[in-house]
Swiss-Prot record:
Keyword Glycoprotein set for record: yes
Protein name, as recorded: Folate receptor beta
Changes seen on gene knockout: No visible phenotype.
A single Gene Ontology CC term: external side of plasma membrane
Residues carrying covalently attached carbohydrate according to the record: N62, N193
Native source organism of the sequence: Mus musculus (Mouse)
Alphabetized UniProt keyword annotations: Cell membrane, Disulfide bond, Folate-binding, Glycoprotein, GPI-anchor, Lipoprotein, Membrane, Receptor, Signal, Transport
Family according to the record: Belongs to the folate receptor family.
Amino acid sequence: MAWKQTPLLLLVYMVTTGSGRDRTDLLNVCMDAKHHKTKPGPEDKLHDQCSPWKKNACCSVNTSQELHKADSRLYFNWDHCGKMEPACKSHFIQDSCLYECSPNLGPWIQQVDQSWRKERFLDVPLCKEDCHQWWEACRTSFTCKRDWHKGWDWSSGINKCPNTAPCHTFEYYFPTPASLCEGLWSHSYKVSNYSRGSGRCIQMWFDSTQGNPNEDVVKFYASFMTSGTVPHAAVLLVPSLAPVLSLWLPG
C-alpha cells in the first residue's frame, strides 16, 4: 500500500500549499524563463527529439536546435567532463525538450528570483521508467557535480567544472536513479511510483502520433488544485490521511 500513498501525499501537499502562480492558470501555460515563449502554440519545425511537442509548444525552433548541440553558447555544455555517451546525452536532450517545450507543467510551476528566469518547476512527478532508464544510460558517463543548477565556472561563456569539482562517473555522484532525477536540477523532478500510461505521472518520452499523454496528467492534478478537494476514494487508499482529508471533503 505504501506505493499508493505517493500521488495522494503529493495531492495533499499541492492542495494545502498551492502553486507559485494563479490557480486559474494551470493548463496550457509556459514558464516565465529565458528561452520560453509567452504562450504555447504550434511549431511545425521543432528539431529532432523536441518534435513530439510541435503541435503545441513553449519552445521556439531555434531553442530546439540549440539544445541538441554539444557546444551551444545559447544552451548547456553536456561534455564538461569529456564527451558524454550518446545514449546518456539523448536523455538530457529529452529532459531539456520537456523543460523548454512542455505546456503541461502548470501545477508545479513556482516563482523564483533568478537572473535568467522568474519561474521554475518543482517536484514534477516523473514516470519511474523515464528516471530509471535515464540513470542506466548515464551511469558510466562522467560529470563533476551533483546539482547542475549552480556552482559552474561560466567565465568562458559556457559551463565548465570548477577547480574544486573533480570528474567522476555519474554513478559516483548519483548512486541511485532517484538521486539523479531528483538531485540533478534541485528537485525539479520527483520520481513517481506510477508508470507511463497511468495518467498519474509526466512522461519525458512519448509517441506524438498517439497524442500527448501529459495533457491528461496535468488535468488530473490541476483539478484538485482548483477544487481544493480530494475524492472519497482517496481516503480508502490512505486511511491515515482520513482525519486531514475530511476537513476538505463535503459531508
